[in-house]
């Protein structure tokens, strides 16, 4: 289960030998330009933080604590400042906040951003192991004169960085890096090879452009005077599956319900994408029951292409149309459902916007259709849970289970 939600944008820079305050207006303007490049990720609010050695900027899509949750968030301890810009969502905010309150911390917001900053101040750099969620964030620690970049375990939230004239730059998207004076985009040879050979995929850490790197999933970076260190706090491992079929069903059921329920926590209404497939139907069923318990009705959306009923052809990926299964779901669950449709001209016109949104070549009409439909859904809901990525996790694609594809020789 994956979500189309919580898309704030973060950006900034760091120079251990810098003195940004001497030219405050200039560097504040650079920070503003960087978050303006990310305004499509969140245009509810924006903010900047500037010290002698670092600058942080944030473009906010307000989901939690809409009134007092503006970023960057700045706190003090023993006369030293700590600042954070954050993109993501925690699913164990209350548990962490409870432990921190017992240790004497007082919260002035209900955001998970403040919880993360206090957790760092209290537990130290490895606090990230306690986080359950999706995130990319930067923390400035004035007590140690260091900047830290963190990324979630599987890389749901993007975070790129580069070095220009001895300065560290970071941002949610490469385009914001190129707002820094003197840094222009240039595709690297390795990046071009990957685009042509395995695109739209790319190897982890490859930013496609020259001198653009990506913080690896499950990693955090520490930048201080003359040093940069890369730390792994989580890594995927494999082990024999010894559970029985019944135990496996029970475990997967618990994990799905726990995951979806935790992601329903929001200060704005949550909806789901309902394609009629198994993945989105399970997410919708769990979300619908959650909403019913709270006396609310879930908004659901399904998407189709104009004249798909005429031109649809069965294939290995989609043996039959989804629409009949959407109707079956709606017979079983009471939701506020909206059918959305897209024609080929709209799909084509959104192609450039889709590439611009990702800064990389992508899945062509898959990306452009999703971007277009999301723009329609946003008129009703800011937060959407989807069934995206379930095929990757549960082996839903044909090459996971069809014998002739498993045994085929070839690359990729």
Task: Write out the residue ranges for each language-model feature.
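Cysteine-centered catalytic environments shared across enzyme families
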Residues: 5-357, 370
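Residue-level signal for short amphipathic helical patches enriched in basic/charged
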Residues: 91, 361, 380
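Active-site adenylate/phosphate-handling loop in enzymes that bind or generate adenylated species
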Residues: 153, 347-350, 364, 371-412
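Short loop/turn hinge sites at secondary-structure boundaries
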Residues: 199, 359-361, 412
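Short glycine/serine/threonine/alanine-rich loop segments
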Residues: 335, 360, 382
């Amino acid at each position: 289960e994956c979500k189309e939600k919580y898309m704030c944008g973060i950006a900034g820079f760091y120079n251990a030998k810098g003195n940004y305050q001497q030219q405050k207006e200039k560097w504040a303007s650079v920070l503003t330009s960087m978050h303006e490049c990310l305004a499509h990720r969140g245009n509810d609010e924006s903010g900047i933080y500037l010290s002698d050695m670092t600058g942080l900027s944030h473009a906010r899509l307000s989901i939690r604590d809409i009134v007092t949750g503006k970023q960057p968030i700045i706190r003090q301890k023993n006369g030293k400042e700590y600042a954070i810009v954050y993109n993501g969502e925690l699913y164990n905010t209350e548990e962490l906040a409870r432990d921190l309150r017992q240790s004497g911390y007082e919260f002035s917001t209900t955001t998970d951003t403040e919880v993360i900053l206090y957790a760092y101040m209290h537990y130290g750099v490895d606090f990230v192991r306690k986080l359950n969620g999706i995130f990319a964030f930067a923390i400035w620690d004035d007590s140690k004169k260091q900047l830290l970049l963190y990324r979630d375990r599987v890389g749901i939230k993007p975070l790129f960085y580069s070095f220009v004239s001895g300065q560290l730059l970071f941002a949610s998207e490469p385009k914001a890096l190129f707002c820094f004076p003197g840094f222009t985009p240039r595709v690297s040879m390795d990046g071009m090879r990957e685009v042509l050979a395995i695109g739209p995929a790319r190897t982890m850490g490859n930013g496609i452009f020259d001198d653009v790197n990506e913080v690896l999933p499950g990693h955090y970076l520490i930048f201080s005077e003359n040093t940069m260190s890369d730390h792994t706090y989580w890594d995927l491992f494999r082990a024999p599956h010894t559970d029985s079929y019944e135990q496996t069903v029970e475990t997967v059921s618990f994990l799905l319900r726990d995951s979806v329920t935790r992601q329903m926590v929001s200060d704005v209404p949550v909806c789901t994408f309902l394609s009629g497939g198994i993945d989105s139907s399970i997410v919708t069923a769990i979300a619908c029951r959650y909403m019913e318990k709270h006396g609310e009705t879930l908004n659901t959306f399904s998407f189709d292409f104009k004249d798909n009923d005429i031109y649809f052809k069965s294939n290995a990926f989609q043996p039959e149309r989804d629409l009949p299964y959407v109707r079956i779901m709606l017979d079983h669950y009471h939701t506020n459902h909206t059918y959305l449709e897209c024609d080929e001209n709209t799909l084509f016109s959104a192609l450039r916007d889709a590439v611009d949104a990702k800064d990389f070549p992508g899945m062509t009409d898959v990306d452009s259709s999703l971007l277009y439909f999301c723009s329609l859904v946003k008129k009703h809901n800011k937060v959407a849970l989807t069934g995206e990525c379930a095929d990757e996790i549960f082996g839903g694609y044909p090459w996971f289970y069809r014998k002739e594809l498993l045994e085929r020789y070839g690359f990729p």
